Curated annotation (Swiss-Prot):
It comes from Oryctolagus cuniculus. This is Indolethylamine N-methyltransferase. The gene is INMT. Pfam families: NNMT_PNMT_TEMT. GO terms for molecular function: amine N-methyltransferase activity; N-methyltransferase activity; thioether S-methyltransferase activity. Monomer. S-adenosyl-L-methionine binds at Y20, Y25, G63, S64, Y69, D85, N90, D142, A143, L163.
Amino acid sequence: MEGGFTGGDEYQKHFLPRDYLNTYYSFQSGPSPEAEMLKFNLECLHKTFGPGGLQGDTLIDIGSGPTIYQVLAACESFKDITLSDFTDRNREELAKWLKKEPGAYDWTPALKFACELEGNSGRWQEKAEKLRATVKRVLKCDANLSNPLTPVVLPPADCVLTLLAMECACCSLDAYRAALRNLASLLKPGGHLVTTVTLQLSSYMVGEREFSCVALEKEEVEQAVLDAGFDIEQLLYSPQSYSASTAPNRGVCFLVARKKPGS
């Protein structure tokens, strides 16, 4: 993109949650690359957090944006979930849904699909209430800080989740590598990092605005995770991509890694 890296000030001023949600999470118009990407993530998360999968007391989601789909599986296996985002508007959008305020975004299609994966599509309303009860706080975050939740200090968590966020928050591969080390600092030794990264994406559209990303290769993501003190337990590549007019990525990788006990 011509304007260079999109920093925090631009996100705070110009990132409009409803434009983002309507572009990437609107399923009224039938099948789309965006809907398929959501299904890919929900399927991966179900396998990761479902029966026999990761569980624990505390999970921190870094860079939640205005979305809740990413913790629909985890709310069944963790007791205390923290959502976080850099911008005020995104945190306000999350609060609207959590508090069931008028005009909150309708996540019913995602809730129903998540429940289908669990074998009980009829309990989607129960799932929504379970998630609302499990999310204990919504905090400001900045993955580029040594403590991404500054000024709040939370006890080390069992799991850190970050989907489709780090590549947007970081201005370079070096910054991405540093951000992963920052995320590692939020975890207990032996805790897990769960992440989805869009590959080879240099920018994406939200409404009429273009936001920059660091274009990452699968091998760069893998090496950055290893160098941040993790052992990789699962690395799944998919050619799944968004619509070329909104987010022209080339594939995506889903990764589960365990923080080394001594790190």
